[in-house]
């Protein structure tokens, strides 16, 4: 799962060290300053949820994207109050709407830069922005898997040498990470539902797979024992005008902050 991959990255792949001490301290800086760039897609939402609910948290978490709709949705799912209850100060920034994104982001750290920065889109400007907002001993995690074998970006090697900047990549989580995320989900601390935006049945599966790059939103949850066209959760209310079952699903999801839930699933399995 995306959350288990985040678990692997933030506990075991990212690392820090001290001058003169040749030992890596694995994981993000506990109580440090973290940024997740281009992180309001399904993969990023899973990471935000993990960062706010795991045992090793930053004190500052900054989320960026250039899609205002996705950014707004993320801020509704992970409110300032929600983060504060977990000991984290959270900010959401649309980097397309500020004159100087690098300065804007660095200012949120008090000018020190970030200890840990993760990139959730394989896009050169985002990678280079991540490099520019790193602080001393900053770790840049290139989480997004690229499809272009020639993807490259500028990286400041002066800062590598003198400021101990370093770079890691993610290859996903392992069985232990999956176990941790299942445990957190079972305890109610991690909610995978934040990544789900559509539901469908077996009859919708082929078209959904073939057209996946063209379908907006996050994860598509398919119920193979049901015949059901692919439907966005946000469209339940409209479909409910002609189908009482979707009217009820709209009511249930509203009660769960617009998210899919066990209650919604139970209703679907019993009524579709």
Please report, for each region that a protein language model flagged, where it lies by residue.
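C-terminal hydrophobic helical "lid"/dimerization subdomain
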Residues: 14, 21, 99-104, 128-132, ...
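Adenosine-nucleotide cofactor-binding segment
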Residues: 40, 48, 52-127
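Hydrophobic/small residue at the entry helix of a nucleotide-binding pocket
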Residues: 43
């Amino acid at each position: 799962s995306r959350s288990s991959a985040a678990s692997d990255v933030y506990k075991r792949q990212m690392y820090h060290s001290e001058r003169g001490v040749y030992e890596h301290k694995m994981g993000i800086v506990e109580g440090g300053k973290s940024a997740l760039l281009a992180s309001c897609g399904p993969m990023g939402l899973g990471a935000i949820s993990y960062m706010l609910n795991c045992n090793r948290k930053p004190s500052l978490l900054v989320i960026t994207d250039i899609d205002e709709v996705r950014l707004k949705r993320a801020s509704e799912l992970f409110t300032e109050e929600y983060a504060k209850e977990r000991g984290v100060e959270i900010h959401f920034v649309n980097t397309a709407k500020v004159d100087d994104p690098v300065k804007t982001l660095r200012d949120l750290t008090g000018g020190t830069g970030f200890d840990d920065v993760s990139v959730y889109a394989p896009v050169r400007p985002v990678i280079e922005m991540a490099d520019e907002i790193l602080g001393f001993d900053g770790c840049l995690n290139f989480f997004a898997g690229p499809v272009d074998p020639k993807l490259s970006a500028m990286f400041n090697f002066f800062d590598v040498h003198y400021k101990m900047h370093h770079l890691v990549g993610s290859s996903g989580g392992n069985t232990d990470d999956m176990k941790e995320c299942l445990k957190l989900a079972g305890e109610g601390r991690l909610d995978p539902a934040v990544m789900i935006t559509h539901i469908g049945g077996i009859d919708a599966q082929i078209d959904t797979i073939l057209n996946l790059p063209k379908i907006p939103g996050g994860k598509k949850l398919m119920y193979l024992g049901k015949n059901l066209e692919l439907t966005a959760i946000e469209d339940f209310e409209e479909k409910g005008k002609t189908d009482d079952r979707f009217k009820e699903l709209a009511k249930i999801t509203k009660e769960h902050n617009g998210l899919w839930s066990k209650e919604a699933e139970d209703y679907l399995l019993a009524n579709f």
